[in-house]
Amino acid sequence: MDFLEIVGQIPLKGGVEISGAKNSALPILAATLLSQQEVTISALPQVADIKAMASLLQNLGAELDWFNSHTLKLCAKSLRHTEATYDLVRKMRASILVLGPLLARFKECLVSLPGGCAIGARPVDLHLKAMQQLGAEITIEQGYIHAKAAKGLKGNDILFDKISVTGTENALMAASLAKGITRIINAAKEPEIAQLCTFLQSGGVEIEGVGSSELKIRGVESDALSLKDIQIIPDRIEAGTYLCVGAITNSQLKINHIIPNHLQAITDKLIEIGFPLDIQQNSIEIYPAKKRQAFEITTKEYPGFPTDMQAQFMALATQCLGTSVIEETLFENRFMHASELQRLGANISLKTNIATIHGSTELTGSDVMATDLRASSALILAALVAKGVSRVHRIYHLDRGYERLEDKINALGAKVLRLKEK
């Protein structure tokens, strides 16, 4: 198992190229199961979750041809079976995204209950209710979801009690081959969902309301879609993380290959804290702040402040003057990084879903353990400003969602080594 050794308090400067968005690539990869045609997906990030999804598709019988590490040609014309097994699904929660496409196209599938980050209760019941609304029979058998729709899926209204990104994506994909019109009410509005809509539209699916909380989908009257090639959008969470690298080290950094509109909640907060930003069409440059002010954050669904940036801003709060408050409203148990930040010297108190961070604090290098994907990046941020050497363990969490993070940070002047545990 690997860990990262990080020498703190080194000045950083330069630019970072942002990779394709993992959270856009995963549903788009799953959606290729709806198609009988070859489709090429470019700008795929080279991260563990993408490799896991590619392995799952290959196991189902899809033909995969990697042109290079970021471009993949797929063909799901003839699958061997429609069972997504535990061995493959347990590696990440996003595996549940194959449920909608498999059910819609093949009328029956078995999908293991998923794994991935251990962040509180992330139930799949919203996905199952959506499939049932489209006419599926659902049973849970020995840890597997067994979904059947012998006569195919039929369009219907799907009302989500709670906004769900992957739930919306599964419903969208299933509705693409359902007979008639489906309305998804209280849909998630993330840019990654908008790109999935674009991909499905390229295959002939009519979708109204893209980017809004209500989507209207007219299913294609055929057995499969004819999807067109697509390039994955830049990863707004990776971009936000590197903006935080600049912010916590108070360095001048340029973040390239981004869509600034997708980052507005993050950039607004950085400006509020005191950072001058130069926002261009596809880049953002962050400059050192004269004074970093404490702040308050409440995580919300897009376009609100993303829960996937909460941990990074908690690390940043340790270097801001005054008392910062972070309220997590979307997931339970998403403050597991707080105790590890405390090991570095952070002054953090927790009460249910609210974290209070007192700054600014001088951090000291130590051994810390990543508990999930975004927590791992928060610990690396803190280590960059800690006095001495830090070691971040269990970075397999990091590798699920960040492409070559140590290489990108080292190119800015940092000293980060990937080493093997003894």
Curated annotation (Swiss-Prot):
It is found in: Cytoplasm. The gene is murA. PANTHER family: UDP-N-ACETYLGLUCOSAMINE 1-CARBOXYVINYLTRANSFERASE. It comes from Helicobacter acinonychis (strain Sheeba). The keyword rRNA-binding does not apply. Keywords: Cell cycle, Cell division, Cell shape, Cell wall biogenesis/degradation, Cytoplasm, Peptidoglycan synthesis, Pyruvate, Transferase. This is UDP-N-acetylglucosamine 1-carboxyvinyltransferase. It comes from the Bacteria. The modification 2-(S-cysteinyl)pyruvic acid O-phosphothioketal is found at C117.
